[in-house]
Amino acid sequence: MNRTRILVPLVAAAAALGVVAPAAADASPSCSTDWGSRPKAAHPTEPGDDLVSDVRAGRHACFDRVVVDVAEVSGFDAWSVRYVPAVRQEGSGAVVPLRGGADLEVALGARGYDDEGHATYSPARPREAVDVRGYTTLRQVAWLGSSEGRSGIGIGTRARLPFRVTVLPGGSTHRERLVVDVAHRWQG
């Protein structure tokens, strides 16, 4: 009887402190986004013959993603991605305001038009090239146009956050993808 009187309060106290029941597993994913926010580039100033064919976005657990499809003509290898005070329209240099706390400029050594001058990528609403409503980090994706073998995309982000850039080869399709991942937050 004495043993029961002692065990019942002891078990109740242990349960209240979380000693008996294991803590619930952390449901948040493990996000390794230590990419930094410094510029990333490969041959950034060279114009190219490759053709921009599409721009799209996606959401992931730890980052938002923008993908640029490039039809490879001569080996797509000229691009740069960096935070800038303001993005500018290709050709005219006019400032293009973006929503969000920071502007990422994506400069491509690829054209948005073919040899006959026909657009290979021409969104109906260039300032809203991709619908990113409801995304955690992305606030706006704008097509900045194409001029003299170069094209530009502006990405408005919630804040200056880490990002990474990957070029995925197209293989036999000859359609490479420039992938820009922008983290949801800095890792502490």
Model-derived segments and spans:
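Short linear recognition/processing motifs and adjacent strand/loop elements at protein termini
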Residues: 26-188
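Secretory targeting and sorting signals
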Residues: 1-27
